[in-house]
């Protein structure tokens, strides 16, 4: 059965994000993936600490000139017969809720782990988010050109800490200075590693068969025998790859390699285009929307503010769920009920910000936004439905915000509410006093808010420390118990930017005790937009 041209386009799409702890090699992997997708000709050489700072500052200069950094957010490139959309999740300096929400717009994730360190804190947090939707995960064990931990130990750690089964696809031969390559468990082939070829795509020498004498000659008898012994163990102790379990988010195929040496990245990409799902259906408040439907629908998962105060435009990122976007089409913004003509949407083909003529499910569009689009907004061709599952996360850092000029309280509140709608920060107004508490997931968010309040709302604000450890959204089906809870805990209650009731806990102990005391009240870590 031949698919219609529309369905052929849908079937070609793969949309994924890379999740990792800072410094596990995400930037390098992104570069190498783009190299394989022919999106760039040679990968930028970021060497060690000294020049990586240098590369970052170059970017910052460029971003200042460009006014808005979009290229790093979404990259589309061809690979084999597929079109791959790679969504960037910001690293440590600018880690924020954006990162979490980006994961709601992808169909699959690549988890990059530094094989010298194993599972780290940020990876755990990001995995919790992918769990909300059982997103399929591929794993890349990186930095095999350094001395790493025992590979079996790494797999055990992923299984125990992240609660996902590991199915090794490739297996390393040596590591550090002795790193010789990887063996592919399902193709019965060994790929030999050459040093110094990290910036371009290299011709890899392949040895067929595990018991081939050429293997002993290539890697040395000791390492060849060690590989055979390890593989016996691995095949006995680890999971076999099963596509259905992968798609259900229960097992992760594991690849070994070095992104810096550009080795093993293509094995992972081959797995990604072969196994990762084409654009998936998405839930709305009324029904499930399939990617095969020809009427357009999409949702906004991120809003990127402009860094240049002269241009107030912000870009809203929309994931296309169904239908084909064509330039100049009329779409309904469901929240406002208004129809808008979208003629200047942006697409992101390999590092260029260009106006798009058409886009399909799985693709990401950039919409110019003058403050009218919010995170979680749904756009359709008229149907009144709202996509669900774009969450707000309970912040982990809190500060009280105070004005230098007390007469500007109104502007401050307006600015904070708008910034919270955009997802830049969360704001809480305690019921029992006039404080304003700002909550964030990353420290950088606080600095951004003060800078933007000054440049966009002409308000000078400063922060003070506040006795808040965490926040939870509260609700209950038992009205009587809920009233009692509200009456007795008034001093700990606040309203967020969308007027949702929140419990502000001074300590985790306080939160745990309160939860025990009021079993009929739900304390939620996430809230839908």
From Swiss-Prot:
Binding-site positions, GTP: 20-27, 88-92, 142-145
PROSITE patterns assigned: G_TR_1, G_TR_2
UniProt-listed InterPro entries: EF-G-like_DII (IPR053905), EFG_III/V (IPR035647), G_TR_CS (IPR031157), P-loop_NTPase (IPR027417), PrfC (IPR004548), RF3_C (IPR032090), RF3_dom_3_sf (IPR038467), RF3_GTP-bd (IPR041732)
CDD domains (UniProt xref): RF3, RF3_II, RF3_III
Entry keyword annotation includes Protein biosynthesis: yes
Pfam families: EF-G_D2, GTP_EFTU, RF3_C
tr-type G domain sequence ranges: 11-280
Localization annotation: Cytoplasm
GO aspect biological process, one term: regulation of translational termination
GO CC, any one term: cytosol
Function statement: Increases the formation of ribosomal termination complexes and stimulates activities of RF-1 and RF-2. It binds guanine nucleotides and has strong preference for UGA stop codons. It may interact directly with the ribosome. The stimulation of RF-1 and RF-2 is significantly reduced by GTP and GDP, but not by GMP.
Similarity-based family: Belongs to the TRAFAC class translation factor GTPase superfamily. Classic translation factor GTPase family. PrfC subfamily.
UniProt name for this protein: Peptide chain release factor 3
Organism expressing this protein natively: Salmonella arizonae (strain ATCC BAA-731 / CDC346-86 / RSK2980)
Gene that encodes the chain: prfC
């Amino acid at each position: 059965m031949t698919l219609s041209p529309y369905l052929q386009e849908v079937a070609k799409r793969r949309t994924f994000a890379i999740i990792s702890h800072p410094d596990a090699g995400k930037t390098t992997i992104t570069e190498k993936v783009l190299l394989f997708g022919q999106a760039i000709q040679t990968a930028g050489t970021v060497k060690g600490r000294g020049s990586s700072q240098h590369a970052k500052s170059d970017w910052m200069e460029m971003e200042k000139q460009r006014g808005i950094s979009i290229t790093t957010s979404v990259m589309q490139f061809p690979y084999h017969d597929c079109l791959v959309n790679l969504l960037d999740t910001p690293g440590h300096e600018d880690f924020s809720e954006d990162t979490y929400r980006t994961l709601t717009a992808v169909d699959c994730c690549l988890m990059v782990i530094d094989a010298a360190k194993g599972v780290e804190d940020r990876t755990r947090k990001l995995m919790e988010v992918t769990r909300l939707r059982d997103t399929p995960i591929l794993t890349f064990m990186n930095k095999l050109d350094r001395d790493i931990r025992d590979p079996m130990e790494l797999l055990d750690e992923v299984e125990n800490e992240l609660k996902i089964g590991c199915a090794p696809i490739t297996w390393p031969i040596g590591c550090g200075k002795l790193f010789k390559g990887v063996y592919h468990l399902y193709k019965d082939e060994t790929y030999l590693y050459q040093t110094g070829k990290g910036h371009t795509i290299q011709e890899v020498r392949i040895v067929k068969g595990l018991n081939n004498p050429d293997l002993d000659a290539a890697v040395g008898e000791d390492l060849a025998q060690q590989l055979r012994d390890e593989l016996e163990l691995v095949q006995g102790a680890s999971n076999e790859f099963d596509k259905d379990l992968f798609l259900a988010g229960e097992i992760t195929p594991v690849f070994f390699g070095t992104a810096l040496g550009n080795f093993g990245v293509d094995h992972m990409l081959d797995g990604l285009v072969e196994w990762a799902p084409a654009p998936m259906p998405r839930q709305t408040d009324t029904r499930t929307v399939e990617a095969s439907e020809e009427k357009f629908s999409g949702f906004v998962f991120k809003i990127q503010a402009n860094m240049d105060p002269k241009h107030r435009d912000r870009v809203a990122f929309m994931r296309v769920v169904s239908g084909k976007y064509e330039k100049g089409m009329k779409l309904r913004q469901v929240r406002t009920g208004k129809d808008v003509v979208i003629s200047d949407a942006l697409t992101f083909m390999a590092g260029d910000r260009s106006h798009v003529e058409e886009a399909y499910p799985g693709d990401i569009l950039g919409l110019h936004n003058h403050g009218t689009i919010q995170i979680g907004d749904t756009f359709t061709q008229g149907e009144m439905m709202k996509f669900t599952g774009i969450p707000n996360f309970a912040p982990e850092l809190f500060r009280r915000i105070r004005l230098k000029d007390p007469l500007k309280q109104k502007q401050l509140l307006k600015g904070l509410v708008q910034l919270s709608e955009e997802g830049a920060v969360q704001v809480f107004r305690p019921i029992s006093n006039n404080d304003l508490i700002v909550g964030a997931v990353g420290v950088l968010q606080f600095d951004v808010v003060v800078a933007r309040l000054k440049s966009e709302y002409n308000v000078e604000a400063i922060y003070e420390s506040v006795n808040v450890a965490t926040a939870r959204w509260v609700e209950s089906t038992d009205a009587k118990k809920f009233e009692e809870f509200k009456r007795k805990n008034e001093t700990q209650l606040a309203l967020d930017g969308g007027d949702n009731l929140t419990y502000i806990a001074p300590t985790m102990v306080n939160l745990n005790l309160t939860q025990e005391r009021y079993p009929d009240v739900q304390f939620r870590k996430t809230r839908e937009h």
